Amino acid sequence: MFRPARRVSWGTWIFAILVLLLAGGAVGAFLEVVLPQRVASLAQSEGSELALARKGASDVSTAVGSLWTEISAKGGIGLSADQIVRDLALAKATEKAADDALGHVQAAETYMAQADGLPFQLHSPAFIAADRPALQHLDKALQAAIKLTHAATLQLTLAQHLIQDAQKISGTLDPSLGAKSWTDAARAASELATDLKAQQAPVSDPEALLDPLWAKWVDAMLAVVTSAQQYSLASAAKQTQQAQQASNSLAAARAQLAATYAAAQNGAAAWQAKAVQPLLGTVVKEAAAAGA
C-alpha cells in the first residue's frame, strides 16, 4: 500500500536551523576566543620555562668551565685532598643544576607540543618556530654539561679513593717494612692489593673521562703492594733469596710508580684537549646560540 512521505514540520526545520546556528556560533567562539587564549596561555608557560632553562644553562656553563679548569691542570688524581672535596661538591651540585635546567627544556617542549596539537589551526603558533631552535641548542649544551659533571664526579670520587690508598702505602705499609714488622706489612699490603684490584675497572670507565695513563699508575701501585707483600712473607719465613728477589722487584715497582705518576701529570693537558675541551666547547657554543 502506497504511503506518501511525511512532511517535515516548520517547527522541526526551525529547530534544526537553530542547532546549526548554535554549533556554528560555538565553533566561531572557540576559534575567536578560546583558541587564542589557550595558545597565549601555553606560549606564556613555554616562555617561562625557556627563560628558566636559559638561566640554568648559563649558570651551568660557568660552573662547568670553572670545575674543569682546575681538574685539567693536573688531572683529577693530581689534585690535593682539599681540592678534591671542594670540586666533588661542585661537580655534584652542577650536575643537579644541569638536570634541573634540562627539565625546564623538556617542560617547554611539552607546552609546544600541546599548542601545536590544538584543533582547528591552519598553522603552528608563531612562538613554536621562534623558540624551538633555542630549545634544541639548550638541550645540546646541557647534555654535554651533564656528561662533563658526571665524569668529574666519577673521576674525583675515584681520585679520593686512590689518594687514600697512596697515603696508606706511605703511612702504614712503608713504616712497617722499615721496622721489619713483616706481619703488619704483609697484612697492609694484602688489604691494599684487594682495594686496588677493585679500582682497576672504575679507572678504565670511559664515562669518567680519565686519562688512560692513570690506569698505568694504578697498575704500578698494585705492583708495589704485591711486591711488598711477597717481600714481607719471604722475610718472615727467612727465605733470604726469595726476599732479595722480592726486594729488587719492589724497588723496580716503586720506580715505575713514580714514572707513571709523572707521565700522567705531564700528559694531563694533552688529554684534556682531546677528551674534555670538545665537550666544554659544545657547552659554551650551544648555550650562547640559545641566548643563555
Predicted regions and their residues:
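Extended amphipathic alpha-helical interaction segments
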Residues: 124-255
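Leu/Val/Ala/Ile-rich N-terminal alpha-helices, chiefly Sec-type signal peptides and the beginnings
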Residues: 2-150, 255-291
